UniProtKB/Swiss-Prot annotation:
The lineage of its organism: Bacteria, Bacillati, Bacillota, Clostridia, Thermoanaerobacterales. It comes from Carboxydothermus hydrogenoformans (strain ATCC BAA-161 / DSM 6008 / Z-2901). It holds the Pfam family MinE. Keywords: Cell cycle, Cell division. The keyword Cell division applies. The keyword Cell division applies. This is Cell division topological specificity factor. GO terms for biological process: cell division; regulation of division septum assembly.
């Protein structure tokens, strides 16, 4: 019985978080597509220097009163010791 209560709490928490994100995105005029593009660009840049868990990466926009912040949670698996220099 406890297991089902825990699952409901998790889905409730996740739904609440999704709603909060939708409201923040609406207030800041940030489309889900823009946020997804930003996430992809961050992955492209960061993977030059670090091995990350792309599936667990979270990028959100948060607002508090009159301030808006970009919040990124990027789990790092490994830091690359050398960086390949790209020449054009």
């Amino acid at each position: 019985m406890k297991l089902f209560g825990k699952e409901q709490q998790n889905s409730k928490t996740m739904a609440k978080e999704r709603l909060r994100l939708v409201l923040v995105q609406d207030r800041t005029n940030v489309s889900p597509e823009l946020l997804q593009n930003l996430k992809e660009d961050l992955i492209a840049v960061i993977t030059k220097y670090m091995e990350i868990d792309e599936k667990a990466l979270e990028v959100n926009i948060d607002s508090h009163e009159d301030q808006v912040a970009l919040i990124a949670n990027i789990p790092i698996k490994n830091v690359k010791r050398s960086v390949r220099v790209q020449t054009n």
